[in-house]
């Protein structure tokens, strides 16, 4: 009976070592590729988050600046991570005055054309009447009873819908300039945005001050009058807010610089806003 031969198959030591080396090279390449891809994704996601946070802050400030009273903007342009602040007065209403006091010793009440929408206030808190503000120095000099700004005590409709309202001030006042278009604004208390350390805050309800307030002087430091707008800011060597005065050919320009940073990644955002300067 013939003997059936069987063949033995296998691999040599050299083949095994070569296979291990090739597999190791492929594994290292795959791990490196996956690691780089993951790092790239995380970096991209982090930068996207920073950009989104910074853009939201800029959009918020831009929206409010479009409603700023003409010539009410003032900026503390100190560079770095100190108290960099931007201040303005938000407009509430605008109308035409009828007999505002400009001469003599002044008056504590006068008439205006009805606001649109109709506005009557029995005891307004921090509402001011403003006529023809031409610069922020004059505007914020609130202690002067002959300036462009006066605190409102009440707004009433004494004749029941005849189209004329009466504004009563908290004290006798004489406005120092007539508006060429008889324009009157109602404004709220000033609002400030400040970069303090690595955070951007919004401040309100601190009153009108001759000198611009900072967090170290007269701005509130608790909720609800201080609100966090953004964090992760490193403005070292940068100026968060800069005001370029208006000229005869263009409006005033406010420049914003925010450098958002986290985990070694940074995104710098530069933005400019044109402000109204026709009072």
Identify the meaning behind each predicted range:
Residues 3-5, 72-83, 123, 157-161, ...:
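Intrinsically disordered, low-complexity coil segments
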Residues 48-203:
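Extracytoplasmic beta-strand-rich oligomerization domains located immediately C-terminal to a leader/signal peptide
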Residues 24-29, 34, 197-208:
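N-terminal trafficking/processing presequences and adjacent post-cleavage segments
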Residues 9-66:
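Aliphatic-rich helix starts adjacent to a transmembrane/signal segment
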Residues 199-201, 205-279:
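Short linear sequence signals and composition-biased patches located at protein termini or domain-edge surfaces
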Residues 1-11:
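N-terminal leader/signal peptides at the extreme start of proteins
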Residues 39, 43, 55-59, 63, ...:
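Short helix-loop boundary/capping segments at the starts of domains
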Residues 19, 91, 259:
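Acidic/polar N-terminal loop/beta-strand segments that form early-domain functional surfaces
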């Amino acid at each position: 009976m013939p003997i059936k031969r069987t063949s033995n198959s296998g691999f040599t030591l050299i083949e095994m070592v070569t296979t291990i080396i090739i597999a190791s090279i492929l594994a290292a390449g795959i791990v490196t590729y996956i690691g780089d891809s993951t790092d790239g994704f995380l970096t991209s996601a982090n930068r996207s988050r920073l950009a989104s946070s910074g853009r939201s802050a800029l959009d918020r400030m831009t929206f409010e600046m479009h409603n700023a009273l003409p010539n009410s903007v003032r900026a503390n342009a100190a560079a770095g991570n100190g108290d960099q602040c931007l201040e303005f007065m938000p407009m509430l209403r605008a109308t035409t005055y009828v007999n505002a006091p400009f001469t003599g010793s002044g008056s504590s009440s006068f008439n205006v054309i009805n606001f649109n929408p109709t506005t009557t206030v029995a005891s307004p808190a921090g509402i001011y009447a403003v006529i023809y503000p031409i610069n922020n120095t004059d505007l914020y000099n609130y202690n002067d009873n002959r300036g462009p700004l006066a605190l409102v005590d009440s707004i009433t409709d004494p004749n029941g819908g005849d189209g004329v309202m009466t504004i009563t001030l908290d004290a006798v006042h004489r406005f120092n300039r007539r508006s060429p278009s008889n324009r009157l604004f109602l404004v709220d208390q000033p609002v400030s945005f400040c970069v303090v350390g690595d955070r951007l805050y919004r401040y309100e309800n601190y009153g009108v001050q001759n000198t611009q307030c900072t967090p170290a002087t007269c701005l509130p430091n608790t909720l609800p009058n201080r609100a966090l707008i953004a964090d992760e800011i490193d403005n070292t060597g940068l100026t968060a807010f800069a005001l370029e005065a208006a000229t005869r050919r263009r409006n005033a320009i406010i420049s914003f610089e925010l450098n958002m940073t986290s985990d070694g990644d940074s995104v710098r955002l530069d933005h400019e806003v044109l402000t109204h300067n026709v009072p």
